[in-house]
Structure formats: C-alpha cells, structure tokens
UniProtKB/Swiss-Prot annotation:
Name of protein: Peptide deformylase
GO BP term, example: translation
The protein's role, per its UniProt record: Removes the formyl group from the N-terminal Met of newly synthesized proteins. Requires at least a dipeptide for an efficient rate of reaction. N-terminal L-methionine is a prerequisite for activity but the enzyme has broad specificity at other positions.
Organism field: Limosilactobacillus fermentum (strain NBRC 3956 / LMG 18251)
Gene: def
Cofactor comment text: Binds 1 Fe(2+) ion.
Pfam families noted in UniProt: Pep_deformylase
Family: Belongs to the polypeptide deformylase family.
EC number: 3.5.1.88
C-alpha cells in the first residue's frame, strides 16, 4: 500500500520526478502490475474520508509512477462521480503510455488552481490546460483505448501526463501574473 511517505516531493533531491519517464512494454512484469494496482488503490482509499484519515492520506484523483520514484509512463486516474444518485466514476483507469492525440483550442482552468500530492505547499495561480482532449493509452492488459475527455477529467489527465514528462503544474502558471489566463479560458471547479 502506498502511503504519503512513499510519495516523492518536488523539493527532494535524487528523484525521477523531473525526468521524462520510460515507455512501458507489454506484457507488464509482475512489478508493473503491482505498481498499477498500488497507484489505483491509493486513489480509492484516499477518496474514502474514513480510510484516508486512518492512513493519513491526502485525497487525490491521479497518481503517476514518477510520484513514487518509478520512471515509467504509467498513472492511475480516478475522477469520482459528481452525481449524487450515481456513484460511477466519471473516469477510472490506469493509463499507460498515454498520448494526447487531439486537443481543443479552448482552454480550461480550475478556479481554485491545482494541487499535487508531490507538492506540500499551496501555489496560487491559474493552470491553463486544453478544455477538451482525445487521449490514447493502453490499459494494464495492453489494450489500446481512445477516449474524449472534457473539463475536469481532461485537466486531471493532462496533469498526470505532465508527471510522465517531468513537468509539474506550477510550471504552467504565469510567473508575472499568476491569475492571468488566456482569453476565453473556461473556469470551473
């Protein structure tokens, strides 16, 4: 089970957090299969208030392999339902070797900015991202998927893909004016 102590922080030296992660080949090794399970398990437990408190976990909607110091193109994403009558997640999968094959010109950003399990401090500012994306990735069985995502799930997946490329969310914040976003940016969240 992954705990907060296992998650690499952005101020730690000698980690793979800022490296471009290696592509994953199939079939997955036993270690890679376990990593995929562990990443998703962290998200599931962290989104359960009682269990998160029991294990001292910060809630998350995404966790990438480089965040646990493993340089592999793998991330778990679990965007919970926003429908009180249906608790089916909006998006839930372990995305392996993900590639954004198309993206909207329209940008989107969270009104409260973004956070990250690898960043312990609050960093104010808008993180402009593409509002809609088409994502191509492989699952743990090696099956290829192509999905269209918009708004929050698109932002979450772009955040996780950034981790696979050695990029952190605050790299996207305008350094001179943190609360400036491209004209026409859609805000939500």
């Amino acid at each position: 089970m992954i705990l907060m102590k296992d998650i690499v922080r952005d101020d730690q030296e000698g980690t793979v957090l800022r490296d471009y992660a290696a592509k994953v080949s199939f079939p997955l090794t036993e270690e890679e299969q376990q990593l995929a399970k562990d990443l998703m398990e962290y998200l599931e437990i962290s989104q359960d208030e009682e269990l998160a408190e029991k294990y001292g976990l910060r809630a998350g909607v995404g966790l990438a392999a480089p965040q646990v110091n493993v340089s592999k193109q793998m991330a778990a994403v679990l965007v919970p339902s926003d429908d009180e009558e249906d608790d089916t997640p909006i998006f839930k999968d372990v995305i392996i070797n993900p590639v954004i094959i198309s993206e909207s010109v329209q940008m989107g950003a969270l009104t409260e900015g973004e956070g990250c399990l690898s960043v312990d401090r609050d960093i104010a500012g808008y993180v402009p991202r593409h509002d809609r994306i088409t994502l191509k990735y492989q699952d743990v069985q090696g099956e290829t998927h192509k999905v269209r995502l918009k708004h929050y799930p698109a932002i979450v997946c772009q955040h996780e893909i950034d981790h696979l490329h050695g990029v952190l969310f605050y790299d996207h914040i305008n350094k001179d004016n943190p609360f400036e976003a491209p004209e026409g940016t859609v805000f939500f969240g």
